[in-house]
Amino acid sequence: MFSITTLRDWTPDPGSIICWHASPTAKAKARQAPISEVPPSYQQAQHLRRYRDHVARGLDMSRLMIFTWDLPGRCNIRAMNYAINAHLRRHDTYHSWFEFDNAEHIVRHTIADPADIEVVQAEHQNMTSAELRHHIATPQPLQWDCFLFGIIQSDDHFTFYASIAHLCVDPMIVGVLFIEIHMMYSALVGGDPPIELPPAGRYDDHCVRQYADTAALTLDSARVRRWVEFAANNDGTLPHFPLPLGDLSVPHTGKLLTETLMDEQQGERFEAACVAAGARFSGGVFACAALAERELTNCETFDVVTTTDTRRTPTELRTTGWFTGLVPITVPVASGLFDSAARVAQISFDSGKDLATVPFDRVLELARPETGLRPPRPGNFVMSFLDASIAPLSTVANSDLNFRIYDEGRVSHQVSMWVNRYQHQTTVTVLFPDNPIASESVANYIAAMKSIYIRTADGTLAILKPGT
């Protein structure tokens, strides 16, 4: 199993620190990189604009994906150097950097020859845990080298860390790092040749296809109409967390909370209940959230957006970049029955996956004023299901590497929830604004949701009545 926590909670074992930084020559090549006609993806453009706006307001938004894992013995620096550089040269998502040439237009610069990309190791002496956390959190998305890799060498083991701008990657990077850095390193130190990998896909190609696809959309396109209808049912935007979150006009850092929902046996019984209802585990996850919201707010319809990977082709599955999209989910819960909620939730999720290829930002661009659509407001709610009981994530989750994922804990305006299924348990992790009102609301939501999971698994869930 791997854990998800905030970076401020990380206290690594003492040891010497070696970090891989972009070489001066590579930085010079990046500065000289010509302008590319490839547009940023919608995800990248939205992220860059949010980052610029936060900086202008003196706010510090989360922008990194940070991972660590442990390995026994002393690090073979030469082997690790090979693995890291091979990874960076292999994936074109690391080959570009961006700048604003006016208020809104974003320009991409691309290094033409991957061989010009090189990171070199440097030792950092006498760095405290606080200094190390600050060091890992420094990459920002408007610099080319918005990534850091390093190791902390202790007496009998070392900790590897990677800090990569979300601009370049999405959660699927977990499996990529496991293969291309951990397994590559292990092969090399074991005396084997470098692992043979299939050709990587090009994220640039995805950006071009996405731009062409979204440019062809109109307000009459079926996928756009479905987004407009969903937003219209949520006050013209994306769904809001249903319970009070305090004063969100005041910046709050993010707080992360993880709770166990079910053990392995309960998870198996819960899955059986989902199948009996005509759904999969994922449909049951959204059904439990819907029924919890009904208990807490007396609602008759549950709306939420969930993240999903939009990779579909074999080439895309070999491509590193930011492919994550949003799927709108609607679940009527007036009956208070788990079976009907799970079945409808599964249908809503499955039938809505094609909407993940339509960024909500593009819908807002197309919408006429009379539609009443507007950007998400502070307190919007995003819920995700992560199944680490099956490949490829199970390989990482079931390893003995002590694999950890870190959130930076910077300013948080929304509620992000991940239901995580592992081989031996199912957990929920929630990131939310760190204030007493939001903390109480999230705790109440988790308690209601956990009760429904357990009662469903135990076969004791009767028809739920609001407020019960």
Swiss-Prot record:
Translocase found in the keyword field: no
InterPro entries on file: CAT-like_dom_sf, Condensatn
Pfam families: Condensation
GO BP annotations listed: cell wall organization; lipid biosynthetic process
Annotated keywords: Acyltransferase, Cell wall biogenesis/degradation, Lipid biosynthesis, Lipid metabolism, Transferase
Protein name in UniProt: Trehalose-2-sulfate acyltransferase PapA2
SUPFAM superfamilies: CoA-dependent acyltransferases
Family (UniProt): Belongs to the PapA acyltransferase family.
Catalytic activities: 2-O-sulfo-alpha,alpha-trehalose + hexadecanoyl-CoA = 2-O-sulfo-2'-O-hexadecanoyl-alpha,alpha-trehalose + CoA
Biological role stated in the UniProt entry: Required for the biosynthesis of sulfolipid-1 (SL-1), a major mycobacterial cell wall lipid. Catalyzes the acylation of trehalose-2-sulfate by adding the palmitoyl group at the 2'-position to yield the intermediate trehalose-2-sulfate-2'-palmitate (SL659).
Record-annotated membrane-spanning stretches: none
UniProt source species: Mycobacterium bovis (strain ATCC BAA-935 / AF2122/97)
EC number: 2.3.1.288
GO MF annotations, alphabetized: acyltransferase activity
